[in-house]
Amino acid sequence: MLFRSWVSSEARVIDVIRDSLLLFGEALMATGDRFALCGFSSVKRSNVRFHRLKDFDQRFDDRARGRIMAIKPGYYTRLGAAIRHATTILEKQTAARRILLILSDGKPNDLDLYDGRYGIEDTRVAIVEARSHGIVPFCVTIDREGASYLPHLFGPAGFAVIRQPDELPARLPMFYAQLTR
């Protein structure tokens, strides 16, 4: 799973993200499915931060939980770069179904030219590239305007808009169950 560190004036949103990742990690561990948890944020092209909170070969233990608890709101959303990095990681997995579940708070953007159409198109190309490698990208967003641009990026069935961040902990396992059927 790839999540974008939310930038929000409400500290509560990041708390919901932490809780969601902790509960989702516990649920995935109970299924026996192999999974990784990663995060990202960016400040221009030269500074994309990709954080590996739990790798596929690591246990979901107190160290992984501690890394999740240490998550802080980040900067910008250079989503195409993060998807490409996650694709490289997922390509090495031999699972029958490789799912890239993305949590985001809004449109791809950054301080440079990545804002606007360029960021949208770069992200769309990264999604097409991921699919060409047999990866199934799915985006969950709390951006209420997500329905206006996410179909272009992920297709009509490749995303979900969550209007209330509090719904995230309960809905993540449902999305995962749908994606793994």
Task: Spell out what each predicted region is.
Residues F3-R181:
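Acidic, glycine-rich A-domain
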